[in-house]
Amino acid sequence: MGKQVLVDLSHPFGRGNPLWPSNGDFHIDRVQHMPMHYRLLQTFNDFHMHNSTHADSPSHVIPEGAFTHELPLENYYGPAVCLDIPKSHWELITVEDIDEAAKKVEGGIQEGDWVIICTGMNKRWGENDDYFAYSPGCSIEAANHLVFDLKVKGVGFDLQALDHILYTYAAQHGPGPYVPRIVEEYKAQFGHEPLEDYPEWEPVHNILLGNNVMGIENIGGDVEKVKGQRFMFCAFPLRWYMGDGTIVRAVAFIDEDKLNKDVPDRVYKYGVY
């Protein structure tokens, strides 16, 4: 047994971080700065909570659902497994994917676990089509399996949303399409509208959050170091009154001997002076 170490599973946030297609940028002002005031004081004048690594609250999609300040801290903490389920261009995470990946983790998935799903897309985190426009995602069947069969506490994805991109208003749902080119590309590739294959608006959001199962989007940081492992997990929110979700600091508490040591430390190109 090695010592316990903390592994950051979060992307940095701030001005310049990658943005979901409809999200506005951070606007940050320096009210005081060192040369003049001998202190630094910054204000966020425009701050989108559904940015970078964040947890959605039920009120985000469920009428009269719980707001962030109403959720107990226990919801954001507990034993976890990180499943290695490689996915790419518009692929779906299936029930079979989850069950097969769980067999490779100590103890499998147990009732009340957090399940962190590592598709490898965290490595493409950036303002590019791979991460956003062509994002894979969780199938309806897999979401139901996690909630009703496996009875998990929460699910975190290294993806742009809890849902496949074609279940969102980036495509044909709600006020969409915010990214009309993916609709045209899908029609050219498959010969029909994506709406035929992805008819519901954010079904995975509704399945998870509608049953008080937590959901985290954009898991990142050094998640590749804990892939295939069991550990303790936390992703505590800001105590935002009436919030529908907040940026979180997702962290794995794990024995250092269990780390995937061939994975280098994650270095981000943005947020570097």
What are the language-model segments listed below?
Residues 1-273:
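Active-/binding-site microenvironments in catalytic and ligand-binding cores
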